[in-house]
Amino acid sequence: MIRLLERLGVPRVLMLGFLAVAIFMTGDGFELTFLSKFMVDQGFTSSQASLLVTVYGLFAAAGGWSAGMLAEMFGARRVMMFGACWWIGIHLLFLGVAIPSRIYPLILGLYALRGIGYPLFIYSFVVLMAQHISPSRLASATGFFWTCFSLGIGVFGAYLPSFIMPVFGEYRTFWFALPFSIVGTIMCFLFVPKNKVVKGEGLSRKEQLKELAEGATILVTNRKILICAIIRIINNLLLYGFPVIMPLYLCTTHNGGINIFKTEEWMRIWGFVFVVTLIFNTFWGWFMDRFGWVWPMRWFGCAVLAVGSVAFYYIPQWFGANALMMIVASIIVGIGTCAFSSLPTIMTLYAGEGKQGAALSAY
């Protein structure tokens, strides 16, 4: 197994770090496929449920923007630990205080703040990858990184709650996320190495702020990075939008919902998106290292995702509660999503030496 990972470009010093990412993201993904339905069932509107995830995404974007530069400035492991501890602390407040209070502004605020944590954890690790892995193997290693990410947030993060929720209920299922996030944090502390280079050492506060600002200014100064960032945004609209709208569409009668699947059935259908990514994230990384990076994203990413998104809506309309056909749609979406797995690799190479963190912040 170790030799196989090394052939994929994963150095031994980072192997347990990849595992930490998978375990931590299992906790982060626990509520992804049923939070919007849970909120509607608690008496909130569909718009309020959607806004909750939208604002979470905005704060996650802020965390992602700062992650790369902070990791280069202060050390990736330090930023990963901060992000993980932030996530755990806010999650405790969200579950223990906000949800029981049923005060929507409090729920919205705490859930949004939690969104800062996980990008600091995972994207700081990508900075370490860029420093420890040669450019010729970086696409393959990045593909494996997204495989670990998908294993956590999508496979275990979708399938485990689908079996836990019928037994313990939706609210108690939220709490099962904590052990995974805590274990991932401990593994980060014990096994993730320090940066080879920490840019913030010896810099004044003014110079540090200037370095941090590069995560935004690079979008202006480097047109290729801007284009990659726009592609990333469009790609993620489906991956994070469908878990919000599809449970309302497939499992309720709210706002035109057709209510043909149970919530746990929907969770298992969506989980197939990420089961596929376990294979195709690594495959596309290997494939692009050998045959080029851009054209697979164009044809297997953009085009295939377009087909998958349309299929998710029309298959229930045409075939009813046909789980097998929905799984086929999930597989199509998974294959298309994976075709973008090397996008951060392309961005770091476009950025040039010493600006990988800024490029990943834009990502």
Regions found by a protein language model. Name each.
Residues 57-65, 154-155, 274-282, 338:
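Residue-level signature of mid-helix packing/kink "hotspots" within the transmembrane helices
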Residues 1-11, 195-229:
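Juxtamembrane intracellular "pre-TM" segments in multi-pass secondary transporters
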Residues 120-133, 338-352:
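Intracellular juxtamembrane helix-capping segments at the cytosolic ends
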Residues 73-84, 289-303:
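Cytoplasmic membrane-interface "Motif A"-like loop-to-helix N-cap segments
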Residues 64-75, 280-293:
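Helix-to-loop junctions at the C-terminal end of transmembrane segments
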Residues 110-148:
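Cytoplasmic helix-loop-helix junction between adjacent transmembrane helices
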Residues 31-36, 224-270:
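Extracytoplasmic gate region of multi-pass secondary transporters
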Residues 85-101, 303-319:
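C-terminal ends and interior cores of transmembrane alpha-helices
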